[in-house]
From Swiss-Prot:
S-adenosyl-L-methionine binds at residues 60, 62, 80, 96, 121. The gene is rlmE. This is Ribosomal RNA large subunit methyltransferase E. It is an enzyme of class 2 (transferase). GO terms for molecular function: rRNA (uridine-2'-O-)-methyltransferase activity. It comes from Francisella tularensis subsp. novicida (strain U112). Its EC number is 2.1.1.166.
Length: 206
């Protein structure tokens, strides 16, 4: 299949996707909003006054939902390599999470406060090389887990997108070392053919 044909196929699938259509109807920023809503409905992670950090946040599908749960007295920091239009109550950092400069900016905003929940929908820019792309994905996941391990409150929680493949089982073992409860969850709003699932980790051991 030519590149042009594959692009047309993706556009058709995207524009006819139920969750894309629903997101447009409801004014959500992306279909990803439904994933975090499913996670919240099932696990009740977000509560008023919580401090949450959203990694890989653009275009804001998760942040726009989470801020509703934590309220005006909560705190939400969102970070992404791409631009993100402002969301009321959300502090945004644009930068590469794997760079020291961006990490320092995030730490400055965190300001030594303990975080209640770290959420990550990060994914690498895909090269088309499955082995390389999977390795990059696991690297970002490890960075997100390291950040959570350093900054979470005792009994805090961690949510991250994982692509099933080389290194994913080993990654889950690392998560289990830090949290008492670790669950694999695939939202209904995930595309059926996608290898993604979400790790829902609660009761951080501290």
């Amino acid at each position: 299949m030519s590149k042009g044909s594959s692009t047309k196929k993706w556009l058709h699938e995207h524009t006819s996707d139920y969750y894309v259509i629903q997101a447009n109807k409801l004014g959500y920023r992306s279909r990803a909003s439904f994933k975090i809503l499913e996670i919240q409905n099932k696990y009740q992670l977000f509560k008023p006054n919580m401090f949450v950090v959203d990694l890989g946040a653009a275009p804001g599908g998760w942040s726009e939902q989470v801020i509703k749960y934590i309220g005006k007295n909560g705190k939400l920091i969102a970070l992404d390599l791409l631009e993100m239009a402002p969301i009321a109550g959300v502090e945004f950092i644009q930068g590469d999470f794997s760079s020291d400069e961006t990490y320092q900016k995030l730490n400055t905003l965190v300001n030594n406060q303990k975080i209640d929940c770290v959420i990550s929908d990060m994914a690498p820019n895909l090269s088309g090389n499955k082995t390389s792309d999977q390795a990059k994905s696991i690297y970002l996941l490890e960075l997100a887990l390291d950040f959570a391990n350093t900054n979470l409150n005792k009994n805090g929680s961690f949510v991250a997108k994982v692509f099933q493949g080389q290194g994913s089982d080993e990654y889950l073992k690392l998560v289990r070392e830090s949290f008492n409860k670790v669950i694999q969850f695939k939202p209904k709003s995930s595309r059926a053919k996608s290898r993604e699932f979400y790790v829902i980790a609660t009761e951080f051991k501290g």
